[in-house]
Amino acid sequence: GLLGGSSFASSGLLHFRQTYHYNESILPEWWAQLNYDRSQLLDFRAVTGGGIRTSFASGDWGQFGAGVALMLEHERLDLPATAIHEDETTLVRWSTFLTLRLVPNENLVITGTTYVQPGFGEFGDVRTLANLRVAATVTDELDLTVSFDLRYDSRPPDLISALDTSLRTGLRYTY
């Protein structure tokens, strides 16, 4: 965006995931992620973890799967000095997820992923993330997308709502 003639970025995300395809039933994977989000007072977040995923059902209609993992999360927040929430935390979390990919026809794909991430040994500290995306083919390389995101934190930082949602439209280019 632009503010006062200067460009700025209010959020950023870098994510890497490696999934190993040893067999069709159990797929081990690991990932690492860095991000920040000024609207959530998040100066820095680093996450790394690993686990397994599997597909329960698949066919021409799409795919349904799930996974479980353990992850290490480190966050640094931009909080006022009077904040109750700690401004820097490191926590081990479970990460469980469900994935769904529906293909009603060759020009439409609906995907959904829901994560539930309780603190390891602190099940009252839960984060839930959900994404639903509809992609409609425009050309072989271009899709029009509509995405809905939901984020819930049972212990949000001071001044931040426990529930956050967003609706976005976009174009996805694949080459």
Predicted features, each with a name:
Residues 1, 32-38, 54, 70-76, ...:
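Transmembrane beta-strands of outer-membrane beta-barrel pores
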Residues 8-12, 44-48, 62, 88-94, ...:
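Residues that define the transmembrane beta-barrel architecture of outer-membrane proteins
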Residues 24-73:
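Gram-negative (and chloroplast) outer-membrane scaffold detector with strong preference
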Residues 30-32, 66-68, 96-98, 112-114, ...:
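Membrane-embedded beta-strand positions of outer-membrane beta-barrel proteins
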